[in-house]
Amino acid sequence: MRHRKSGRQLNRNSSHRQAMFRNMAGSLVRHEIIKTTLPKAKELRRVVEPLITLAKTDSVANRRLAFARTRDNEIVAKLFNELGPRFASRAGGYTRILKCGFRAGDNAPMAYIELVDRAESQAEVATAE
């Protein structure tokens, strides 16, 4: 029985899942918005939000913990130099999930996951108008 086992399996083994979410977390931190399937977005939120909370207090130990979870120094630098200070006054809820229809090939529900205080770039504003 699978009582009280949280998290989605997503038809992957544990190492594949861990690698996938490590890559997706890095992409989300780097680009601040990514498009993925809705179940992956909901699981990614459980990976990224603790990383941002960790980045709110800058210390060598926290940087090493973040590196152990992301395996990318560029991501760790952005977490602690930009995102940690940006979300210092926010107590959780750093990401937003926006549903965006269904994928053409297999009708999978798609979603954007983004950081809530993301700066709107000029290119996105121009395409919206």
From Swiss-Prot:
Keywords: Ribonucleoprotein, Ribosomal protein. It comes from the Bacteria. The keyword Ribonucleoprotein applies. PROSITE patterns: RIBOSOMAL_L17. Gene3D superfamilies: Ribosomal protein L17 (3.90.1030.10). GO terms for biological process: translation. GO terms for molecular function: structural constituent of ribosome. One of its GO terms (cellular component) is cytosolic large ribosomal subunit. InterPro entries: Ribosomal_bL17, Ribosomal_bL17_CS, Ribosomal_bL17_sf. PANTHER family: LARGE RIBOSOMAL SUBUNIT PROTEIN BL17M (PTHR14413:SF16), RIBOSOMAL PROTEIN L17 (PTHR14413). Belongs to the bacterial ribosomal protein bL17 family. Part of the 50S ribosomal subunit. Contacts protein L32. This is Large ribosomal subunit protein bL17. It comes from Serratia proteamaculans (strain 568). The gene is rplQ.
